[in-house]
Structures are given as C-alpha cells and as structure tokens.
Curated annotation (Swiss-Prot):
Any one biological process term the GO annotation gives: mitochondrial electron transport, ubiquinol to cytochrome c
Key word tRNA processing present: no
Any coiled-coil regions, as ranges: none
MF-aspect GO terms: metal ion binding; ubiquinol-cytochrome-c reductase activity
UniProt source species: Saccharomyces paradoxus
Cofactor info, note text: Binds 2 heme b groups non-covalently.
Protein's name in the database: Cytochrome b
Residues annotated to bind heme b b562: H82, H183
CDD domains: cytochrome_b_C, Cytochrome_b_N
Length: 385
C-alpha cells in the first residue's frame, strides 16, 4: 500500500485531494472552491504580517496603517494585497454561490453543505466589516457608527447593545480595539468552518452540471482536476496582481484616506462594494427595525432554497424557465449593488424597493412556482413520448 494511504495523516490528504473521485463532467465553475481556499490563505497570511505592525489604539490606528504603507519593507504590497484580496474573495464567493444556485448544489443530499456555506458567507461579511473599521479612516469611522447603530432598532435593549458594542457612548478606542481582536480571530473560525464544509462535501461528493448522479463516471482528482485548478489559480493571481500593482485603490473608497473625524460627516456613507446590495435592501425599507430585519433576512433566505425548490431535476441546465429567471435574479442583484452606491433620492428609493421585492420573490415565489410548472411540463413530455 502506498505510504500516502497507510499514514494516518497523509491518508486524509489523499482522500480529499489526490484519490478523491470527482464526476468527469464538472466544468470550470467547480474551480471556485479552490480559489476561495487560496483567497483565505492570502488573507490570513497577509493579515498576520500586517498585525505585526498595526496598532489598534484609536490615536495610532490610521497612522500605523500609513506606517505599514511607507516604512515597512514591501508593506504597501501587504496592505494592497490584503485589501484587494478581500474584494476578490467576495467576487469568487459570489460566483461560487451563483454556481450553487444555478446547478442546484443546495438540493438534497447536500443541504448541510449548503447551510455551512451560508454560515461561512455570514462570517466573511462580519470579518470584512470589522477589518474595514480597523483602518479608522473617515469612511471606517462612520461605517462603524452606522452599522452598529442598527442594533438600536431592537426594542427595549437596542441602545444598551450599541453601548456594549462600542464600549462607551460612541465609536472610540475600545471599539477599534475589540473590532481588531475579533477581526484577527474570526478568519480562523472561518478556516474551521471551511474544514466542516469539506467534510460535508466529502460525504456525498461533488455535484455535476448534468444534475444526475456522478457515481457511474468518476475520475481521481489528481492529476486531472489538480492541473485544471492550476489554470484558474494562475489566471486569478494574474488578475489580482494587475489590481495590486497597477490599480490598488479602484475597489476602495477615497474618503478612507482621510483620518476618522467624528465631527465631520461624509457626503455619502457607503460600505465596501461587496456589501452594497444588502445596504440597498436596508435603505429600501423606511422603517428602521423592518429594514434591519429585511437586510439580515436577505442573507438567511438562502437557507430556505432546499425547501422551496420542488423540481424533480437538479440544476437549471435543462430548464429554460429557471435559466431565464436565474439571470433576471443575477441582473437584479447587480442592480441592487448599483443602487446601494447612490444617494437616497428619487428614483433610487423606488428602484431599490422594487429590486428588493424581486430579490425575495425569487426565493419565496418564483423558484417554487417555476419548479412546479416545470415538473408538470416534464411529466407531460414523458407521457407524450
């Protein structure tokens, strides 16, 4: 028996990355998982090195970031790689989730796999917000103020929760210090959840574009899919390097190069681009409490998909109606992101409300109705044949 199979530790690596049987029909959309793993490693490694030079004291936070940029050897690469790496992390994560929605990766028997993935998504959003506040630029300060103030919408205990989060009566030194501590901790929790994600994946194996069982036609991951992964890894690193070295601030906000000032409010308070769709959903509801509930529901609604999709066929590969409405959903999500970056004024308020309705309607109305209609059409086609 090969040593990689007989050794207790290497046998785990072997079963997950070398001899793991994969459906032969999977395409490049199944490469997003390896890219997300690469992104997580990049974020953790660059974050650890930046933490060696960062000071979480509110008086020194902004200056320490500039110290990393100006005085630390190759510090600007660390900072830009970490900042742009976060954006690319979310780009790939959105594509990974879109693949799951399109190909029905949330369907039984992979419900646990999907649920763990949603938890990872929530933790990643929290980590990104905490890290954005640590810079303590102008947008960081006011972003922290606005987002933490959302908890004040909770009846009776809301204001107490906000004061507890701040560690005082406003965003101050305890706030930044505890945000940095959590920002350092949560990525390791994400790494643990990723291991759970892989364990859940390993139980039933990967799905495939055809939506049928792949047990009849599987090939080992190495060397076929390992080298296929390397193609996307090299392409990803090339595109990331172009942003890091030639356009490092394109995905950021210029106001964050101004030190945080609680006495001056920015003209427009917006989060990073990857949180804009959920920010637009928050702003589309006039009532504060309902807006907060709707924003969190926009993420948690992903958990209901395994129960609302009643189709007898997994995935949208052979379903014309589902394909059409899926791409409507994608366009609507991009539109929400664009609306989130705009001021709260006519016509963006109404557009945001319509887009929010379409977003929730896709999960709660369109998917169950269309899947039922397609089931009837499949049945009629089978009988007539």
């Amino acid at each position: 028996m090969a040593f990689r199979k007989s050794n207790v530790y290497l046998s785990l690596v072997n079963s997950y990355t070398i001899d793991s049987p994969q459906p032969s029909s999977i395409n490049y959309w199944w490469k997003m998982g390896s890219l997300l793993g690469l992104c997580l490693v990049i974020q953790i490694v660059t974050g650890i090195f930046m933490a060696m030079h960062y000071s979480s004291n509110i008086e020194l936070a902004f200056s320490s970031v500039e110290h990393i940029m100006r005085d630390v050897h190759s510090g600007y690469i660390l900072r830009y790689l970490h900042a742009n790496g976060a954006s690319f992390f979310f780009m790939v994560m959105f594509m990974h989730m879109a693949k799951g929605l399109y190909y029905g990766s949330y369907r039984s028997p992979r419900v646990t796999l999907w649920n763990v993935g949603v938890i990872i998504f929530i933790l990643t959003i929290a980590t990104a917000f905490l890290g954005y506040c640590c810079v303590y630029g102008q947008m960081s300060h006011w972003g922290a103020t606005v987002i933490t103030n959302l908890f004040s919408a909770i009846p009776f205990v809301g204001n107490d929760i906000v004061s507890w989060l701040w560690g005082g009566f406003s965003v101050s030194n305890p706030t930044i210090q505890r945000f940095f501590a959590l920002h350092y901790l949560v990525p390791f929790i994400i790494a643990a959840m990723v291991i759970m994600h892989l364990m859940a994946l390993h139980i039933h194996g990967s799905s495939n574009p055809l939506g049928i069982t792949g047990n009849l036609d599987r090939i080992p991951m190495h060397s076929y899919f390992i080298f296929k992964d390397l193609v996307t890894v090299f392409l990803f690193m090339l595109i990331l390097a172009l942003f890091v070295f030639y356009s490092p601030n394109t995905l950021g906000h210029p106001d964050n190069y101004i030190p945080g000032n609680p006495l001056v409010t920015p003209a427009s308070i917006v989060p990073e681009w990857y949180l804009l769709p959920f920010y637009a959903i928050l702003r589309s509801i006039p009532d504060k409490l309902l807006g907060v509930i709707t924003m969190f529901a926009a993420i948690l609604v992903l958990l209901v998909l395994p129960f609302t999709d009643r189709s007898v066929v997994r995935g949208n590969t052979f379903k014309v109606l589902s394909k059409f409405f899926f791409f409507i959903f994608v366009f609507n999500f991009v539109l929400l992101g664009q609306i989130g970056a705009c001021h709260v004024e006519v016509p963006y308020v109404l557009m945001g409300q319509i887009a929010t309705f379409i977003y929730f309607a896709y999960f709660l109305i369109i998917v169950p109705v269309i899947s039922t209609i397609e089931n009837v059409l499949f049945y009629i086609g089978r009988v007539n044949k």
